[in-house]
Amino acid sequence: MKAKEIREMTNRELEAKLDELKEELFNLRFQVATGQIENPMRLKQVRKDIARVKTILRERELNIS
């Protein structure tokens, strides 16, 4: 997910996306622990997507464009 796509979302959509990504991260960590993960790079992608969403939300909170 690109930052441009994230910026086009509303705050509610971002919060929903954040919850979705956190749940996916939880499931991926569980798969790593049990040795069933198919794509280990997805873990890194999800963590970075979470960081992007949190950054955009914080920018909006501080009114930074």
Curated annotation (Swiss-Prot):
Keywords, ordered alphabetically: Ribonucleoprotein, Ribosomal protein
BP term (GO), one: translation
GO CC entries: cytosolic large ribosomal subunit
SUPFAM superfamilies, per database record: Ribosomal protein L29 (L29p) (SSF46561)
Source organism superkingdom: Bacteria
UniProt-listed InterPro entries: Ribosomal_protein_uL29 (IPR050063), Ribosomal_uL29 (IPR001854), Ribosomal_uL29_CS (IPR018254), Ribosomal_uL29_sf (IPR036049)
Keyword check for Protein biosynthesis: no
Molecular function per GO: structural constituent of ribosome
PANTHER family: 60S RIBOSOMAL PROTEIN L35/50S RIBOSOMAL PROTEIN L29, LARGE RIBOSOMAL SUBUNIT PROTEIN UL29C
Family recorded in the similarity comment: Belongs to the universal ribosomal protein uL29 family.
Protein name: Large ribosomal subunit protein uL29
Gene: rpmC
